């Protein structure tokens, strides 16, 4: 099931593998196509293909029909109190008809007076002709349903109102603009960028916040990562301060009891400090940093000149599929930047994979410390990578790329340099 909806909505839509539309887990609308040769039931067709356009909650489902495809696009809009728009596009050389299994939906024109013929559908089903390269639009009105059983069945909107709703291209651009405020990566491993897009859209679709703060340590980590991502996406940090501070305390206590830290613990503490900093909770931020420093033997407080002694907990090359949700975002970003225990910002802390040699790549606005963001690009000059970087935040940040060039170290907020190359042999990425 692929999710559709609006940012922070009180409802959540979904589209199953063949294009049936759901609202809050209940099936609301099915579609069927009458082509030149026969009726097509999407749930029984072997030619169904589906994708999320640009990775955002705009779901496109295609079915092969004579001369091309019948295309369904489903997405949520906030207009009219909330609606799920269903567009049927005839991407074929022949006309066809589309049927819906309910008639109490908003449509751009009246259904065919002949009704549905040649297929057994529920009473009240409606059918519409769709010409060559034409589009038929319908909508399920959500509105202020107050979680009742009906779906605004008695509410009607005009064809003009339906036509004025945003197109799928506009909704796609809106989602991408919402994501543009946080970190972005353009790297040879394309799935990493897709992960950031998909997981962040899932966050934006839910308004109450995920990350159950139960009794398990992983729940506290997930809560912190969830709230930090929401802040990076534009939420006000103040509303999350208390629960993030409590969750950070639980993570610290667990690490102390266990006598070790994991990379997820480090990302959680970094994220908690970032959120507290953005909320203006300087004392809380400093308390977390001091507690973390004590836990690590005060190595966080070491100066940059002692960078050779800095350490980063290894993520290794575990497949990202081992994780889910916000942990996947943390995994991707930790492959590209990390803060050492001595405070130095490490670019590509696990090195550059051998499979990336010769491929230029860049990353934007990655969280590098509680107070800093970093953007960087790698451009190849023969066998050597040139590094360009820019740090946002207060002066005093130090940058290194020890897994690529052990000699490189800079206290400049922006700059460029030609790195020596690989200091360790990198294996192929686990995808």
Report each predicted region and the residues it spans.
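Terminal accessory carbohydrate-recognition/targeting modules of carbohydrate-active enzymes
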Residues: 1-197, 201, 306-431
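Hydrophobic/aromatic-lined pockets within catalytic cores
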Residues: 146, 229-235, 256, 280, ...
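Substrate-binding groove/exosite segments of carbohydrate-active enzymes
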Residues: 173-295
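Carbohydrate-binding/catalytic loop surfaces
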Residues: 213-214, 249, 258-279, 298, ...
């Amino acid at each position: 099931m692929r999710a559709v909806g609006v940012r922070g909505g009180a409802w959540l839509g979904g589209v199953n593998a063949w294009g049936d539309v759901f609202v809050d887990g209940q099936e609301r609308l099915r579609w069927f196509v009458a082509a030149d040769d026969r009726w097509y039931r999407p749930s029984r067709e072997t030619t169904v293909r589906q994708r999320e356009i640009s990775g955002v909650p705009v779901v496109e489902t295609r079915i092969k029909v004579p001369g091309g495809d019948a295309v369904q696009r489903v997405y949520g809009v906030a207009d009219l109190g909330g609606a799920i728009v269903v567009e049927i596009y005839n991407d074929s050389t022949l006309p066809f008809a589309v049927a819906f299994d309910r008639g109490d939906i908003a449509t751009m024109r009246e259904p065919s007076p002949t009704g549905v013929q040649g297929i057994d559908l529920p009473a009240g089903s409606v059918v519409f002709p769709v010409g060559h390269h034409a589009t038929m639009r319908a909508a399920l009105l959500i509105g202020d349903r107050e979680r009742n059983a009906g779906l605004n069945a008695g509410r009607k909107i005009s064809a003009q109102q339906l036509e004025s709703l945003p197109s799928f291209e506009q909704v796609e651009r809106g989602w991408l603009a919402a994501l543009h405020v946080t970190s972005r990566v353009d790297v040879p491993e394309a799935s990493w960028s897709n992960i950031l897009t998909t997981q962040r859209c899932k966050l934006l679709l839910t308004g109450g916040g995920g990350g159950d703060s139960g009794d398990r340590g992983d729940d506290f980590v997930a809560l912190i990562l969830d709230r930090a991502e929401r802040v990076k996406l534009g939420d006000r940090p103040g509303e999350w301060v208390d629960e993030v501070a409590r969750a950070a305390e639980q993570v610290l206590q667990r690490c102390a009891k266990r006598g070790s830290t994991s990379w997820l613990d480090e990302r959680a503490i970094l994220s908690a400090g970032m959120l507290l900093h953005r909320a203006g909770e300087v004392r809380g931020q400093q308390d977390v940093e001091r507690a973390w420093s004590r836990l690590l033997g005060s190595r966080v407080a070491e100066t940059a000149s002692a960078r050779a002694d800095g350490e980063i907990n290894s993520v290794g090359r575990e497949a990202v599929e081992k994780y889910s949700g916000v942990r996947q975002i943390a995994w991707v970003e930790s492959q590209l930047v990390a803060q050492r225990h001595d405070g130095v910002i490490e670019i590509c802390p696990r090195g550059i994979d051998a499979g990336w040699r010769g491929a230029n790549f860049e990353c934007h606005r990655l969280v590098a410390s509680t107070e800093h963001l970093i953007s960087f690009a790698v451009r190849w000059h023969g066998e050597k990578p040139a590094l360009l970087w820019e740090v946002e935040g207060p002066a005093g940040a130090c940058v290194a790329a020890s897994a690529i060039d052990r000699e490189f170290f800079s206290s400049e907020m922006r700059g460029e340099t030609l790195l020596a190359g690989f200091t360790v042999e990198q294996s192929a990425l686990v995808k």
